[in-house]
């Protein structure tokens, strides 16, 4: 069984952050994981810890590109779409994919998306994020 610290460490390493998780990062994950529901404001608080200075892309012109992916344009619709996504009844896999496609923040989307996935998994990542997500992806493709 992976500890929360293991999960945060792996999530950070995916982003090229090779240091151990900070206490603030661990606490932010614990607080998010303990919520009965996650609202946009909860993710804003989380992202402020894991990526200080990053903001929800609610302003026109706050556009992002990640590799070949161009996220939807920034503006008020991003907040509405994120709220709808959080309220929706999607699988952890599907919600994570839609979240990463939306890319709602100026930075910190990968780590916040993985934290959201962990929350949807009931706070447990028994065999690690990448392994579990890999099999969820295969299952989704087979449906």
Walk through the language-model features, giving the residues of each.
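FIC/Doc superfamily catalytic core
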Residues: 1-143
């Amino acid at each position: 069984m992976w500890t929360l610290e293991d999960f945060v460490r792996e999530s950070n390493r995916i982003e090229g952050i090779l240091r151990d998780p900070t206490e603030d990062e661990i606490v932010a994950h614990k607080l998010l994981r303990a919520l009965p529901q996650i609202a946009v404001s909860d993710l804003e608080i989380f992202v402020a810890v894991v990526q200080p200075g990053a903001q929800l892309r609610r302003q026109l012109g706050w556009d992002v590109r990640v590799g070949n992916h161009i996220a939807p344009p920034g503006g008020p619709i991003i907040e509405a779409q994120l709220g709808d996504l959080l309220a929706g009844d999607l699988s952890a896999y599907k919600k994570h994919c839609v979240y990463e496609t939306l890319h709602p923040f100026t930075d910190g989307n990968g780590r916040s998306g993985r934290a959201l996935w962990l929350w949807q998994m009931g706070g447990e990542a028994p065999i690690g994020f990448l392994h579990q997500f890999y099999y969820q992806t295969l299952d989704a493709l087979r449906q």
